[in-house]
Amino acid sequence: MSIDTIVAIATPPGRGGVGIVRISGPKAYAIALCLNGNKALQPRLATFCSLYKGNNEVLDQGLVLYFKGPHSFTGEDIIEIQAHGSPVVLDLLIKESIAAGARLARPGEFSERAFLNDKIDLIQAEAIADLIQASSDTAARMALKSLQGDFSKKINQLNEELIYLRMYVEAAIDFPEEEIDFLNDGNVSQLLQRIIGRLEEIRSQANQGVLLREGLSLVIAGRPNAGKSTLINNLAGRDVAIVTEIAGTTRDIMREHILLDDIPLHIIDTAGLRDSDDLVEKEGIKRAWQELKRADCVLLVVDINNRDQQNSLLNELRLTLPNKIPIITVYNKIDTTKLTAKCDEHTVYLSAKTGEGLDELKKVIKQVVGYQPTEGQFLARRRHLQALDEAKALLLTGQSQLTNHKAGELLAEDLRLAHQTLCEITGEFTSDDLLGKIFSSFCIGK
């Protein structure tokens, strides 16, 4: 447990009916007695008290709750004071708590103490922040599942299988005189393949969680007057970009945020891509290329009446952008032709003006980025995906060592590193730098 005692306001800034001050640490109970005039508190019971300044002047009345460690969120003694939600009153309670021996908590320090005292793992700690910041009902439900341990259980079960395989492999290395040749034993290969399959399944589910948490950066690109601004207006359901017949109207980056089946979609409209001598337009085009290189997905909007635009610009995009960025070609202005809306894997025919084909576009976007709502069972972060990818790469390397070289020692080392990488997800093995980065992004009172 920590030596010092921390205090912070646990409710959002501003005025409200109720404001909560949270205290955690060895002096929490003594500080509460200083604030409530030495009125005894029973664990897990709300006690109505007058709250005093150091000079015994009453500053408010409210409820005081006492959670005795280790049976509390942080694992330490916790006091929660529910006072009136006046910023002045709450600030005075903070000052009096500090005068009585507490210090102001760092962002996320309550959750950090819960993690360090083994009350929650790192996934659950992150889920607290994700639940607070959830942008949709689905994201909130998935964050709650992570907080309840759904994601952690999957990682822990995977680790248990990996530990068993490590024990089997390392025991066979340590006792080579045994009659069984583990390198040619199909059991090792089967176990390893099963673990890789389970890891891929969890990775797919985690990817859905990342999409729900972080959303998707969707950049709209194309030649001038292809209908990019009309498209962003239609996707947003309101006029966010100026639309005229004058080529080059959009000269700067335009951003809009919407929900696409609970996926936060960060839409970015860009200047028309062409050669220009206009200094302002050239700067807009430069910024457009910067956004394109950071995109999760690109919509290449093409005027269907000028299809020759498509090939040259599509080739330029493919040569310039990383291969991992998918490009959806959107043939716009079908309302000026006899064509109807349709789509395939990376192509959509629509009218941004009338909205015909917009549903098909949304469907293709979800398919291209791999969104499968039936698979999303918990919220996840990019660091989780990176760890899962790294663990898979190590397991595949180990599989190669076993299959091609019969190198048991090298297989054992790859299994050890994969196990350690997976443990970083839950925080069993985690650097102090990563912990600092994660918890510093929390609210002060969390």
Swiss-Prot record:
Binds 1 potassium ion per subunit. Mg(2+) binds at residues 229, 250. GO terms for cellular component: cytosol. Residues 215-370 form the TrmE-type G domain. GTP binds at residues 225-230, 244-250, 269-272. This is tRNA modification GTPase MnmE. It is found in: Cytoplasm.
